[in-house]
Regions:
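Bacterial N-terminal signal peptides
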Residues: 10-18
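N-terminal export leaders
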Residues: 3-10
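N-terminal secretory/targeting leader peptides
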Residues: 5, 25-125, 134-136, 140-311
Length: 311
């Protein structure tokens, strides 16, 4: 009897294992790729990249592995050229992305709206734009331009840093070499302020800061801390909140069409959920009254200048 019971148990266990293996090795639906490529400017040490990781993980979990996403930080799918990212999404070189409205503005001029100086004075203003009617209209424009937008994220307010001196007025910027992103609006803004702006990709920015080829840059504080910009001479930060940098979660249209309606719904909701989490991460330490992130940065030996509304 013991032998018979043992055999029954062994056969049952083998059958369960085989069933589990068959389920794990179930073929993908027709038209699905084994892996989808997600483009990001920065890696998962940054709130932006963390948003990509959260989105990918949620999608994999909720689709039970039918949709597997690999992250490609550093805009590596387009050799680091941030301004080519949207075109590559439209062409199918990139399957998915979380991209900056700034980087995509050369192809979608309406996205320059978000780069107008001092348009969004606080987080409530950002939310009013992105989560309201304007945000819906922007999504329609992005859709018409060739990619399917699903959710909003956020890089943050772009504050200016430099290796020379505290900046309190345009006079302090005169002649200063500032790295800016590849949008003509940023060139015009910093030229008008008297600086000497230089466009370059993020991949080139840190070596340029380290060598002194440029004096400063402008980016959210989460970028400053994650990239440890205080180690490349950036010892002065001016909090002026002149431009906020929303992010958009998108999918290539052909890729989207290849998925079942059920999986489309999963990917969309995962993007929305990831976007909310990513925004919370990007604002952490800055939306509290005492701004603890600024205290952490000051403790690194960085001089922080906070401009008054009049300034």
């Amino acid at each position: 009897m013991q032998v018979r019971s043992f055999l029954k148990f062994t056969l049952a266990a083998t059958a369960l294992a085989a069933a589990g293996l068959a389920q794990a090795q179930a073929p993908l639906p027709a038209g699905y790729k084994a892996e989808y490529k997600m483009s990001l400017v920065v890696g998962t040490a940054f709130p932006w990249g963390k948003g990509g990781e959260i989105w990918a993980n949620l999608v994999k979990e909720r689709t039970q592995g039918r949709i597997n996403i690999k992250l490609y930080p550093g805009v590596s799918l387009v050799q680091g050229d941030q301004t080519r990212e949207f075109t590559a999404i439209r062409q199918g070189v990139i399957d998915m992305a979380i991209g900056s409205t700034i980087n995509w503005s050369p192809q979608i001029k309406e996205l320059n709206l978000f780069s107008l100086p001092f348009l969004m004075p606080d987080y409530k203003a950002i939310d009013a734009l992105t989560q309201g009617e304007v945000g819906k209209q922007i999504f329609q424009i992005v859709d018409k331009a060739g990619a399917l937008p699903l959710a909003w994220g956020e890089n943050g307010y772009r504050e200016i840093t430099n290796s020379k001196k505290p900046i309190k007025s345009p006079e302090d910027l005169k002649g200063m070499k500032i790295r800016v992103v590849g949008s003509p609006l940023f060139l015009d803004t910093f030229t008008a302020l008297g600086a000497n702006p230089t466009q370059m990709s993020w991949a080139d920015a840190q070596p340029a800061l380290s060598s002194g080829a440029v004096d400063g840059q402008e980016n959210p504080m989460s970028i400053f801390t994650a990239a440890k910009l205080h180690t490349v001479g950036q010892k002065n930060v001016t909090m002026w909140g002149y431009v906020a940098d929303p992010l958009i979660f998108v999918v290539n249209k052909d890729v989207w069409a290849s998925w079942t309606p059920a999986d489309q719904a999963i990917v969309r909701q995962a993007a929305i959920d990831a976007g909310k989490q990513q925004i919370a991460i990007a604002r952490k330490g800055l939306d509290e009254a005492d701004k603890p992130l600024l205290k952490e940065i000051a403790a690194l030996g960085v001089t922080i200048t906070q401009l008054s509304p009049a300034e």
